[in-house]
Amino acid sequence: MTTVDTQHDDMIHDAILDYYGKRLATCSSDQTIKVFSIENNQQTLLETLRGHSGPVWQLGWAHPKFGTILASASYDGHVIVWRETGGVWSELMDHTAHQASVNAVSWAPHEYGALLACASSDGKVSVLEFKDDGSCDTRIFTAHEPGCNAVCWSPPSLSGSVVGQSPAAGPKKLATAGCDNLVKIWAFDAGVNNWILEDTLAGHVDWTRDVAWAPSVGLTKTYLASASQDKNVFIWTKEGDGPWQKTPLTEEKFPDIAWRVSWSLSGNILAVSCGDNKVYLFKESQNKWQLLNELSN
């Protein structure tokens, strides 16, 4: 385990490695983003990005095929897309369509193109599509009236791709988590050129804080995890065109709010970040989820 001294002056809200695992970006209530080189257990601060006027909640690296690009979501209602060229960082775009805190950003799988989804406390989700000519199309829709806390993309194939084969991109889908206690599934409809509600997943009894779609490599069904202020994590599964099935991750509630959920790259291990300052790792075995480990400071 490597410890990184971020030198932030306030609480850290997100830390994310790039595609190659060699750069770490962190963000904080001090309104800054820091980018580090992480190699051979050595950390080097490469840049401190300043542009937000409020806490920065979440970050997202774009796929490297689009360049060295980082998106940041802030309480100030802005999403800033940063680009590094020749070692110099600059603002590529300042997205100002939202009327309240932007709580989450998520880049689409690269098979879908350079697409960025943003979730806001104004209840809306915006999807930015960056074009090769430098232009950007924006679509915005109301996802959760009381506020939207998280957004994630479906993997490029939802049918359980065969290992070794390149999955078809398939239809574009999003999952969102909101202050209405719901998880919603959205599909892009080219006919109306916007996002259409496909499914509503009810089960939590307090705000849903995060949602994460499992990678589909080698899996025979679709897995989706949701984390909630009600101290529960649910696993939602779907086979083919069948209905979504809900399974509690644990028999007992977590000791505190379940803030974040994250799948391993292979989709077989789920990490849960909890308000008790621990990260819990789970793996499915014989249709039951078993605790593998607890990580704490």
Swiss-Prot record:
The keyword Cell wall biogenesis/degradation does not apply. Coiled coil: none annotated. It is a peripheral membrane protein. Keywords: Cytoplasmic vesicle, Endoplasmic reticulum, ER-Golgi transport, Membrane, mRNA transport, Nuclear pore complex, Nucleus, Phosphoprotein, Protein transport, Repeat, Translocation, Transport, WD repeat. InterPro entries: Sec13/Seh1_fam, WD40/YVTN_repeat-like_dom_sf, WD40_repeat_dom_sf, WD40_rpt. GO terms for cellular component: COPII vesicle coat; cytoplasm; cytosol; endoplasmic reticulum membrane; GATOR2 complex; nuclear pore outer ring; nucleus. The gene is sec13. Gene3D superfamilies: YVTN repeat-like/Quinoprotein amine dehydrogenase (2.130.10.10). This is Protein transport protein sec13. WD repeats lie at residues 7-46, 51-92, 97-138, 143-196, 203-246, 253-292. One of its GO terms (molecular function) is structural molecule activity. One of its GO terms (biological process) is protein import into nucleus. Component of the coat protein complex II (COPII) which promotes the formation of transport vesicles from the endoplasmic reticulum (ER). The coat has two main functions, the physical deformation of the endoplasmic reticulum membrane into vesicles and the selection of cargo molecules. It also functions as a component of the nuclear pore complex (NPC). NPC components, collectively referred to as nucleoporins (NUPs), can play the role of both NPC structural components and of docking or interaction partners for transiently associated nuclear transport factors. The modification Phosphoserine is found at residue 29. The COPII coat is composed of at least 5 proteins: the sec23/24 complex, the sec13/31 complex, and the protein sar1. Component of the nuclear pore complex (NPC). NPC constitutes the exclusive means of nucleocytoplasmic transport. NPCs allow the passive diffusion of ions and small molecules and the active, nuclear transport receptor-mediated bidirectional transport of macromolecules such as proteins, RNAs, ribonucleoparticles (RNPs), and ribosomal subunits across the nuclear envelope. Due to its 8-fold rotational symmetry, all subunits are present with 8 copies or multiples thereof. It is found in: Cytoplasmic vesicle, COPII-coated vesicle membrane; Endoplasmic reticulum membrane; Nucleus, Nuclear pore complex. Belongs to the WD repeat SEC13 family. It comes from Schizosaccharomyces pombe (strain 972 / ATCC 24843). It comes from the Eukaryota. It holds the Pfam family WD40. PANTHER family: NUCLEAR PORE COMPLEX PROTEIN SEC13 / SEH1 FAMILY MEMBER, PROTEIN SEC13 HOMOLOG.
